[in-house]
Amino acid sequence: MQIRPTKILVCGSLAVDHLLRHSGSFKAYQETYEVEAMNASLPISDYRTCFGGCGGNIAYGLGTLGVPTVLLSHAGRDFGDRYEQHLIQHDVDCAFVAVDQNAEFSARCTILGDDFGNQITGFYPGHADPKLRSAANRVCEQTGADFGLLGPEAPELMLKQATELHQFGVPFIFDPGQWISEFNHSLLNTMLSFDPWVFGNEHELDVMTTLLEIDIAALAERSPVVVRTQGARGLDLYVEGAHQFINAEPAKTIADTTGSGDALRAGVLFGLYHGLDLTQAARLGTVVAARSVEHMDPQGWTISADELLATLNPMN
């Protein structure tokens, strides 16, 4: 399967991340102290805030890599403080970020991580009204975007945008992330009827296949492309049902794993933009993910397009 998009429409959330670090491991804590019904009290060794949200992270990655990118999202008034200019400086088209003047704050994501890359995430969508967003098909028509990515958001919003893209003939990635548990059998079947590519980590796709009452192989038969990430191990790539495993690119150091999955997606889309096949694109995705975890902020990593493409040579 070969696809070469010329401009990417990223539909997804914008958030300010609150990142907390527990020195040690969650597993060691659980082995030492009885954890009942998720009740735990942990010391925090580091706390900081940074730009985030899956939509913002992926758009940042694409813009940084030189891929023409349009962001379709909504935000509170605080988006104009620094976040908007930050994305524009990284070549992201923010003309279709709807700012709700009645909402002071954009979404918030609180992530508690340990020293081994494990995370507990809470997402607050904020009060900005998603109904203020432009229709995805109209954005594609106005901007020339010819491939979409639907990042994790409320099921009703994702389904609306999927319908708009499908009716306009724009292929897209369905990436429900932490929202997958809010879907049901019927909604997922409707989403899959649009023949999207499906991205998710092991847990997310386990939830998806459980809701659909199928296994991963059956999901791969229903979707032209399925990418199942496995953290530091790598990823499973299914293309028209055929499976291959792509080893992860090892990171030189681990500063923070937050947003590494979003960076991987940007790397995959970068590869497709440059006319690479899915295997090569997936390999580039692991390189970008590794670069991401070497930096503290999910929108702090950098790598040039030439440098990234050059990493394919020692891999082949």
PLM ranges: what are they?
Residues M1-V70, D81-R82:
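Glycine-rich phosphate/adenosyl-contacting loop at the front of the ribokinase-like
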Residues G63, H166, Y273:
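Gly/Ala-rich phosphate-binding loop of Rossmann-like dinucleotide-binding domains
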